[in-house]
């Protein structure tokens, strides 16, 4: 048989193999409703993400097809919070899907960098999470208050200097983001990045994170394409050629900071941020943990610091903007919060954590902000273990990828009410503690189970401190709220929160208060 006659045979064989694979893929989940293209390809999901409004498209899919929807050949989405304990259990066995592999920055020397939030290997996750978990517990959260107060003092000064005197319209959302990043800079490196001091995106760090997520988000829907196009030497060279080096910029910043700190520690020249308490920043703790435990991989401090820089700052800033925007758009809730803070005798200008941590309406506002616009708005993907599971009457065989989008799940009307699309903090105060607990368990904003967000409690401290500070000290009015825009590129980016600001008549001047 000559070569020419073999070619058609090979072509037929390949075609049959593809048809059989497509048939097998279709057959496994044929009982799950969903759009027809989802049976054969994930490319329509890439298209959804590229619109930057995938959360709304997925919400429409659930309205059309029900609470369980097939959105890819092997991908199922759910919208009912009832499923959360099944898909995101406290035990191991439901590993993260390859979605998260695309969120690992690529380095030529060490390949893709694993971090607590993006590793899919459960043993590795335990290895790199366990050493740092005690730093983020509720009991340890108050230890960060002094660092937050340092940055509160800075934003207080800058708002008074730049915007109080002339009553000009300014980008409040941008300054909230600056605050979140400078807080994390202080916690991680013992110094602010300089966003508040300069009023600018220092070193274009914020822009770099946006670029990184915009590049990564479409790839999350077809992870093998990410490897083929970006996570190899050839793909990486092409990315560099076209200037697609966002992850390298972030890693470069982190690597430089770690190297400088290691040198200072080895010489004994580094001084802690708060010498009275002897409190160490995150970076020093990370380095010492790795040096004192040979089981911790040498790249762990880089991974931990990378997570702080990206997830620990942008997500908190997003929740600050969401909560503040809705308070301003619904002024009766703003005044209700102000009344609670004043009635509780909260310190001014800088509220104390002990005074605000258990305030009911403040907590309801923060809970509602986290529910309304979670910082991450694509499904949190998990792989069904061998033996399969049944959710809401639908059987999912082992190997199926399943997940819920926090944006969609958090708006489940049967759980959160017919007005679930709207801001109403009072929903968290209705009925009894059992009702509130049900709502809390139904919110997917911070994840759930064994992979719940590690920095949740620290983030809530930052948010409550800042919101209380702003509400107590300033009369803020939103300008053109219709310009407030949302972009879903895995991270939920927001733009256009403009406002005017003036001192409340009874506000305390910055110079009259010591922290």
UniProtKB/Swiss-Prot annotation:
Pathway: Secondary metabolite biosynthesis; terpenoid biosynthesis. Its main location: membrane. Its cofactor is heme. SUPFAM superfamilies: Cytochrome P450 (SSF48264). It is a single-pass membrane protein. InterPro entries: Cyt_P450, Cyt_P450_CS, Cyt_P450_E_grp-IV, Cyt_P450_sf, Cytochrome_P450_monoxygenase. It is found in: Membrane. The chain crosses the membrane at residues 3-23. Heme binds at residue 453. It comes from the Eukaryota. Its EC number is 1.-.-.-. Keywords: Heme, Iron, Membrane, Metal-binding, Monooxygenase, Oxidoreductase, Transmembrane, Transmembrane helix. It holds the Pfam family p450. It is an enzyme of class 1 (oxidoreductase). Cytochrome P450 monooxygenase; part of the gene cluster that mediates the biosynthesis of the phthalide-terpenoid hybrid 11'-O-desmethylfendlerol. Within the pathway, mfma and mfmC act together to convert 3,5-dimethylorsellinic acid (DMOA) into the phthalide 5,7-dihydroxy-4-(hydroxymethyl)-6-methylphthalide. Belongs to the cytochrome P450 family. This is Cytochrome P450 monooxygenase mfmA. The lineage of its organism: Eukaryota, Fungi, Dikarya, Ascomycota, Pezizomycotina.
């Amino acid at each position: 048989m000559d070569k020419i006659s073999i070619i058609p045979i090979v072509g037929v064989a390949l075609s049959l193999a593809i048809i059989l694979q497509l048939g097998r893929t279709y057959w496994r989940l044929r009982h799950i409703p969903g759009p027809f293209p989802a049976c054969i390809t994930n490319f329509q999901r890439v298209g959804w993400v590229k619109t930057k409004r995938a959360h709304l498209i997925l919400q429409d899919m659930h309205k059309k097809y029900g609470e369980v929807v097939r959105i890819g050949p092997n991908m199922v989405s759910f919208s009912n919070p009832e499923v959360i304990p099944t898909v995101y259990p406290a035990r191991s066995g439901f590993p993260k899907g390859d979605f998260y592999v695309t969120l690992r920055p690529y380095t030529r020397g060490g390949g893709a960098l694993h971090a607590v939030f993006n590793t899919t290997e459960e043993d590795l996750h335990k290895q790199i999470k366990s050493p740092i978990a005690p730093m983020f517990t509720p009991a340890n959260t108050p230890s960060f208050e002094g660092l937050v107060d340092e940055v509160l003092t800075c934003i207080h000064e800058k708002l008074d200097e730049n915007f109080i005197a002339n009553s000009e319209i300014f980008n409040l959302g941008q300054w909230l983001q600056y605050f979140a990043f400078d807080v994390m800079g202080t916690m991680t490196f013992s110094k602010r990045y300089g966003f508040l001091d300069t009023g600018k995106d220092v070193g274009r760090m914020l822009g770099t994170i946006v670029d990184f997520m915009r590049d990564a988000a479409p790839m999350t829907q077809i992870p093998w394409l990410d490897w083929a196009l970006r996570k190899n030497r050839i793909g990486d060279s092409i990315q560099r050629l076209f200037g697609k080096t966002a992850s390298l910029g972030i890693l470069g910043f982190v690597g430089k900071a770690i190297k400088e700190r290691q040198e200072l520690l080895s010489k004994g020249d580094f001084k802690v941020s708060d010498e009275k308490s002897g409190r160490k920043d995150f970076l020093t703790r990370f380095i010492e943990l790795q040096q004192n435990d040979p089981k911790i991989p040498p790249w762990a401090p880089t991974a931990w610091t990378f997570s702080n820089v990206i997830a620990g700052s942008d997500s908190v800033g997003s929740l600050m903007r969401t909560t503040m925007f809705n308070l301003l758009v619904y002024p009766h809730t703003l005044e209700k919060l102000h009344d609670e803070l004043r009635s509780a005798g909260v310190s001014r200008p800088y509220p104390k954590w002990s005074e605000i941590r258990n305030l009911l309406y403040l907590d309801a506002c923060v809970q509602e902000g986290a529910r309304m616009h979670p910082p991450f708005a694509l499904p949190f993907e998990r792989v069904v273990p061998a033996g399969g599971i049944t959710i809401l009457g639908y059987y999912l065989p082992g190997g199926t990828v399943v997940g819920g989008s926090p944006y969609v799940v958090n708006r489940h009307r049967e759980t959160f009410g017919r007005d679930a699309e709207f801001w109403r903090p009072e929903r968290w105060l209705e009925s009894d503690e059992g009702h509130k607990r049900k709502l809390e368990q139904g919110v997917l904003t911070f994840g759930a189970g064994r992979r719940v967000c590690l920095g949740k409690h620290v983030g809530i401290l930052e948010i409550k401190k800042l919101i209380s500070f702003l509400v107590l000290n300033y009369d803020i009015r939103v300008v053109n709220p219709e310009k407030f825009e949302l972009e879903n590129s895995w991270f939920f980016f927001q733009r256009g929160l403009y406002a005017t600001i003036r001192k409340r008549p009874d506000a305390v001047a910055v110079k009259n208060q010591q922290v």
